[in-house]
Every structure is written in structure tokens, then in C-alpha cells.
């Protein structure tokens, strides 16, 4: 994942961000691209290799993703939302102090704003990600937020993008895909 707002690039003059004492950074793009070209050439007669990444975009990081997209000849980009307001879902920081209604509303609004303003992607990834980190049982996020989810999907479809059906809900023992 590339997660601007949370992580910095390997060559960022400010250095890495630390989480629990461990440095975390985005992909080392020059090294990744060099390795991609090497493997693509080495196995050219056996496999077609495409260049891609998953962009964990937030509205305020769109310009950074635009620059990254222009810097490399990507074939495939998954657009995802992994944080809102630079707060991680998986740590619970984003949900802290908010009701389910509040954090789902803000999550879907961020997703809507991103798909409305960022177009350099191939597929919208796991738009149900919040369910994985929602420790409250029984909240019907789909029906409670159906209008904005519909608006998001209309934009994605109008733009000719794909929509990922992420089946990790089975692994995480969630009730449904949405």
C-alpha cells in the first residue's frame, strides 16, 4: 500500500514515520520499478507482468498520488481508503470517540470525495473496509448509508472503473460483503 498522510516515502528528507518503534515507509518506488523491469524481462516468454500499486488515498493527499501516477507507467491501480483525517482504522484511532454513525458517515463521505476528484485508478478496492475494524455487531452500514454508497458507485461506473468484490469478509468472519 501507498498511504500518504500516514507514511512517508523512503527518500523523504523528514525520514520515516515510526509505529511502535518500527520505521514505516511507502514503497521504494525506484527499487520497485527496477525490480519490476528486471523480472518482466527475465520471464517475458513465460508470463505477462504488469506494473501496479494500491493507493490508499485521502482527499488531502490527491496531489501526491497524481505526482506518483505521472512518475511511473502504471498498468493497474487499486484505489482504497485506509485512513480518514490521517487516522488509521486498524489501530482504532479513527473510530475513537465517534459513534458508528459518525465514523461510517465520515468514511463514506471521504470515499465519495476521493472518487469524485481522483480519476487515475483502475478499480475501487474494498469499499467495505470499515466493517473489518468495526467491533460493534449489528450495525447495518449498507442500509444506513445506501444513498451515498449509491452515489459513489454511480461515479465509479460512469468513470468506467472496476469495483472490487473483496471476499476477505469470509476470513474475518463478517456477515456479508458490504
Residue locations for each model-derived region?
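A metal-dependent hydrolase metal-coordination microenvironment
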Residues: 1-105
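Domain-core and long-helix interface of multi-subunit machines
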Residues: 71-74, 78-178
